[in-house]
From Swiss-Prot:
Binding site for Ca(2+) 2: D70, N72, D74, Q76, E81
EF-hand domain: residues covered: 16-40, 57-92, 101-136
Chain residues that bind Ca(2+) 1: D18, D20, N22, Y24, D29
Organism: Scylla paramamosain
Superkingdom to which the source organism belongs: Eukaryota
pH-activity note: Relatively stable at broad pH range (pH 1-11). Dimers are formed in strongly acidic (pH 2-5) and alkaline (pH 10-11) conditions.
SMART domains per UniProt: EFh (SM00054)
Name of the protein in its database record: Sarcoplasmic calcium-binding protein
Length: 193
């Protein structure tokens, strides 16, 4: 159940975008994401120009996501609305077929994971990304998930490139197969309540 399509989409809403933990997406989440991304990209340093840029990007993203997924136009995107939007707009498609706002979100997320800026998400960055959202008592659990996620080419390259990350993310939210390696993109999953 933890790797079912339904749970993966719930996971994305709950742990990736519902920053204020109120159970739905709204404008505030994207305002908080602007600050979060600015601080992560600056490795803790606050840059007002980068923040202004991130505010603009996240405001535009919220407006696009609200247009695509806020079906009842109440200023909130519930988990069910988000799932319906993903099903309508993403299921069965590769990254290239996704709406522009989804592509932007995925690219911005990769930037927050690639802490050292080398263009790859290595095991060290993967570990940090995983523990920022979930509790683990053993690094082996995280490392095993990374090993299942990576192909031989990823391992030779030293990590997951942006292009590979984009395709993995696309599979994570659009592929119903619980056994595809993309289900490990965000680490070992637990069932979202």
């Amino acid at each position: 159940m933890a790797y079912s399509w339904d749970n993966r989409v719930k996971y994305v809403v709950r742990y990736m975008y519902d920053i204020d933990n109120n159970g739905y997406l709204d404008k505030n989440d994207f305002e908080c994401l602007a600050l979060r991304n600015t601080l992560i990209e600056g490795r803790g340093e606050f840059n007002s120009d980068a923040y202004a840029n991130n505010q603009k990007i996240m405001s535009n993203l919220w407006n696009e996501i609200a247009e695509l997924a806020d079906f009842n136009k109440d200023g909130q995107v519930t988990v069910d609305e988000f799932k319906q939007a993903v099903q309508n707009l993403c299921c069965g498609k590769s990254f290239d077929g996704f709406p522009p706002c989804f592509k932007t979100v995925i690219g911005r997320l990769f930037k927050t994971i690639d802490i050292n800026g080398d263009g790859l998400a290595g095991v060290d960055e993967y570990r940090l990304d995983c523990i920022s959202r979930s509790a683990f008592s053993s690094v082996k659990e995280i490392d095993d998930a990374y090993a299942k996620l990576c192909t031989d080419d990823d391992k030779k390259a030293g990590g997951i490139s942006l292009n590979r990350y984009q395709e993995l993310y696309a599979q994570f939210i659009s592929n119903p197969d619980e056994k595809c390696n993309a289900v490990y993109l965000f680490g070992p999953l637990k069932e979202v309540q």
